[in-house]
Design a protein with these regions (language model features):
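P-loop NTPase motor domains
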Residues: 1-123, 206-227, 234-237, 241-258
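Sensor-1/coupling segment of RecA-like P-loop NTPase cores
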Residues: 118-138
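P-loop NTPase motor core of the ASCE superfamily
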Residues: 49, 113-116, 135-258
Length: 258
């Protein structure tokens, strides 16, 4: 590395410095530095079926996005190595990556490939994105398309405003037959009935945009679209426990750093 071409070396070090820039913040460094009795081994974490929560805001994650992405990528690579040693090359039980707002927090470089290949190794990936436009901005046009195409189940919510994407979704959902009956009266009182058929969108773009809160459209493999009623978390049977956990976590986040 020291003897490498100066231009190549500078380019590599620039990437390294950007990836590790978050560690210049003492708060970030303290958060990722384990104590004497706090080791973290990715393989042990996965084999013991651990659960890890990475919480951040869009503004707060900006400086540490590369560090968070590197951490998640390390877990994914460890999961792949574990899967390769198991029968059928699949993790059992599988690993769930619930990536809510991943486009804002830490866009994973490997997400397109993970969506395409992860399911075969027992890695279930569930990215939650604000829009297809956001995916194109965070990855690229081609990679955003790969993420969309590789999604086995797609849940579409209302509120989108990109006319191109809304029209594409309407086309993907499909069309239905619309029947129109007409009556024609002749000069001599004759009467004729006629029925015509035309193809119309099942859900026009404006209907998709105005889907009410709590309603989504599910596209599952090659099945017809499913209008889905989504259950809000306060209506779940474990809502009381979730409220208690949220209160406890918020108190922990407000606690002053030592």
């Amino acid at each position: 590395m020291i003897d490498a071409d100066p231009k190549t070396r500078d380019s590599i070090w620039q990437g390294v410095s950007l990836a590790l820039a978050a560690l210049a913040d003492p708060r970030v460094l303290d958060a990722v530095t384990p104590g004497p009795n706090e080791p973290f081994d990715p393989e042990t974490f996965l084999t013991q079926q651990g659960t890890l929560y990475l919480l951040a805001t869009g503004a707060g994650a900006g400086a540490s996005a590369a560090l968070v992405a590197a951490f998640v990528e390390d877990l994914i690579e460890t999961a792949r190595r574990l899967a390769a040693r198991l029968p059928g090359a699949r993790l059992d039980p599988p690993l769930l990556l619930a990536l809510d707002e991943i486009g804002n927090l830490a866009p994973l470089p490997s997400l397109p490939m993970l969506m395409a290949e992860g399911g075969g190794t027992g890695i279930t990936t569930m990215p939650v994105l604000q829009s297809l436009a956001q995916a194109r901005d965070r990855w690229s046009e081609h990679q955003a398309g790969a993420i969309w195409d590789a999604s086995i189940a797609k849940i579409i919510l209302g509120g989108a405003s990109n006319s191109r994407d809304l029209q594409d979704l309407s086309t993907l959902i499909g069309e239905r037959d619309e029947y129109t009956n007409s009556v024609t009266l002749g000069d001599r009182g004759t009467r004729s009935n006629q029925r015509s058929i035309r193809r119309v969108s099942i859900l026009p773009p404006d209907r998709i945009r105005t889907l009410p809160f709590g309603t989504g459209v599910t596209l599952l493999r090659s099945t017809p679209p499913i209008v889905t009623d989504l259950r809000a978390w306060p209506d779940r049977s474990d809502a009381a426990q979730l409220r208690s956990d949220r209160t406890e976590l918020e108190a922990l986040l407000r606690r002053p750093a030592p």
